[in-house]
């Protein structure tokens, strides 16, 4: 039986497979990785009846152009994305996000670009035919960990999919509410007291701009310098996703999914889990303001965030 696959006609800027991530490996220097926007990743799987942790393609800015070979499949794209479906009969459909589509052998999907955002997700019913590495499908290109030899997909590659008897699903879609907020909530970092009162006032009152020097490892911010009154270099300590480090130049860096497991810069704050998807989707040039919240409130906001994701998933069902 011929294997089913997606042929990469254009790889896009950074197309990889991601899931919820790999965990409990920090002690050997392996970070969690995983989808940058977990809510949209999970919803993409829900739209095609997959397990919510099934591997999906994640792309940034410009996505891939893919041709389906030897299969008929149900697919879904989530995010704020421009994309077209090029049918083998030469007709073209303008795609709608958060909606399932049925692709037939020979159809192409052209993921043109993200809109006022960074990441999008492409899920196929049944998932991709690849092995987990360290119990996860996630690819970390910096560490070369994960399927596809830890690398992003390239021109001409075949991305194999699990082939099964696939029938066209009843159309599934949801009305997703996009909120373009620039207020990012944080809790105090472990080195909060390393910074002057003036620096703390600046951090919470002034606006920062997302730099072009941002990727899956971290987001650099441009803005007023933060004065460190203790030491700009400390003994390396463990890092977590969302922690905000301040190096010697005084400009904050938010650590993302592919962050190193340890770091030697003071940590002024940590983005709360409820706001992580939101901050990850801010493109270069976006403005950010930070707001301090208590740990108890951060936990409650996260519960609300999870409930909101589950609400969308129930709407799909």
Predicted regions and their residues:
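Conserved "landmark" site that anchors the functional core of diverse proteins
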Residues: 1-317
């Amino acid at each position: 039986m011929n294997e089913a696959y997606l042929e990469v006609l254009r790889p896009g800027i950074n197309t990889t497979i991601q899931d919820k991530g790999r965990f409990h490996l920090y002690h050997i220097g392996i970070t969690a990785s995983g989808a940058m926007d977990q809510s949209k990743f999970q919803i993409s799987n829900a739209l095609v009846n997959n397990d919510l942790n099934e591997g999906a393609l994640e792309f940034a800015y410009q996505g891939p152009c893919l041709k389906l070979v030897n299969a008929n499949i149900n697919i879904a794209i989530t995010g704020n994305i421009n994309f077209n479906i090029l049918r083998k009969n030469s007709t073209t459909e303008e795609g709608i996000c958060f909606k399932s589509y049925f692709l037939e052998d020979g159809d192409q999907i052209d993921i043109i670009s993200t809109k006022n955002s960074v990441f999008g997700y492409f899920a196929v019913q049944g998932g991709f035919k690849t092995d987990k590495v360290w119990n996860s499908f996630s690819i970390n290109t910096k560490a070369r960990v994960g399927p596809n030899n830890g690398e992003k997909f390239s021109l001409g590659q075949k991305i194999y999919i699990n082939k099964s008897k696939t029938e066209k699903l009843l159309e599934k879609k949801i009305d997703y509410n996009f909120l373009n907020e620039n207020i990012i909530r944080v809790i105090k970092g472990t080195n909060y007291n390393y910074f002057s009162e003036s620096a703390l006032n600046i951090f919470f009152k002034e606006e920062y701009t997302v730099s072009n020097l941002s990727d899956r490892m971290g987001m650099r911010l441009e803005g007023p310098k933060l004065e460190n009154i203790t030491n700009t270099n400390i003994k390396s300590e463990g890092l977590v996703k969302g922690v905000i480090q301040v190096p010697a130049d005084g400009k904050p860096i938010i650590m993302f999914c592919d962050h190193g497991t340890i770091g030697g810069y003071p940590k002024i704050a940590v983005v709360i889990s409820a706001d992580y998807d939101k901050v990850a989707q801010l493109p270069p040039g976006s403005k950010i303001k930070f707001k301090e919240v208590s740990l108890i409130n951060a936990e409650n906001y996260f519960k609300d965030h999870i409930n909101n994701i589950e609400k969308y998933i129930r709407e799909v069902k």
